[in-house]
């Protein structure tokens, strides 16, 4: 079984979502199903059908989260002795050599990735180009719009 890399924060967020689904959403949908059943004929009961559909989604998501957490490889970047190299969980400041703009990214697992928050998936082209590099290096990224070059300004393990 392949391990799924997660940062400590990513694992916490999945655990929180799982807890919310089990302790709030699941009981609410069970109550909604019971309420809909009390209205009689289930064959044409839209409330019942909607509640059952919602229950299926909730149970599926609970299963998915439990699986992900069971195969998670939780990585704390502050505990990695990467000696200045960019690794999973690293936060890196880059300068786009074409635009001279600075961007900050954290390299995270697939479930945590959110470009708007500066979190990029470890399997993305930019993350793959950065892994193993260190401050002062230049990374070439094969992007859909062509090759982009970035200077690595700072590497942090936070």
UniProtKB/Swiss-Prot annotation:
GO molecular function ontology, one term from the record: RNA polymerase binding
Keyword terms, alphabetized: Coiled coil, DNA-binding, Transcription, Transcription regulation
Presence of keyword Transcription: yes
Signal peptide: none
Any one Gene Ontology BP term: DNA-templated transcription elongation
InterPro entries listed in its UniProt record: GreA/GreB_C_sf (IPR036953), TF_GreA/GreB_CS (IPR018151), Tscrpt_elong_fac_GreA (IPR006359), Tscrpt_elong_fac_GreA/B (IPR028624), Tscrpt_elong_fac_GreA/B_C (IPR001437), Tscrpt_elong_fac_GreA/B_fam (IPR023459), Tscrpt_elong_fac_GreA/B_N (IPR022691), Tscrpt_elong_fac_GreA/B_N_sf (IPR036805)
Tree of life domain: Bacteria
Coiled coil: 46-66
Annotated function: Necessary for efficient RNA polymerase transcription elongation past template-encoded arresting sites. The arresting sites in DNA have the property of trapping a certain fraction of elongating RNA polymerases that pass through, resulting in locked ternary complexes. Cleavage of the nascent transcript by cleavage factors such as GreA or GreB allows the resumption of elongation from the new 3'terminus. GreA releases sequences of 2 to 3 nucleotides.
Family that this chain belongs to: Belongs to the GreA/GreB family.
Protein name: Transcription elongation factor GreA
Taxonomic placement: Bacteria, Pseudomonadati, Pseudomonadota, Betaproteobacteria, Neisseriales
Gene: greA
């Amino acid at each position: 079984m392949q391990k799924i890399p997660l940062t400590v924060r990513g694992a916490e967020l999945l655990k929180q979502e799982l807890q919310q689904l089990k302790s709030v959403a699941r009981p609410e949908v069970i109550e909604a199903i019971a309420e809909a059943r009390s209205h009689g004929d289930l064959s044409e009961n839209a409330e019942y059908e909607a509640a059952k559909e919602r229950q299926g989604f909730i149970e599926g998501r609970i299963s998915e989260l439990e699986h992900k957490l069971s195969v998670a490889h939780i990585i704390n970047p502050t505990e990695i002795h990467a000696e200045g190299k960019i690794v999973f969980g690293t936060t890196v400041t880059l300068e786009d050599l074409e635009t001279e703009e600075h961007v900050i990214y954290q390299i995270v697992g697939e479930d945590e990735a959110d470009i708007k928050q500066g979190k990029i998936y470890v399997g993305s082209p930019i993350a793959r180009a950065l892994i193993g590099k260190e401050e002062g290096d230049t990374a070439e990224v094969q992007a859909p719009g062509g090759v982009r070059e970035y200077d690595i300004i700072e590497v942090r393990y936070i």
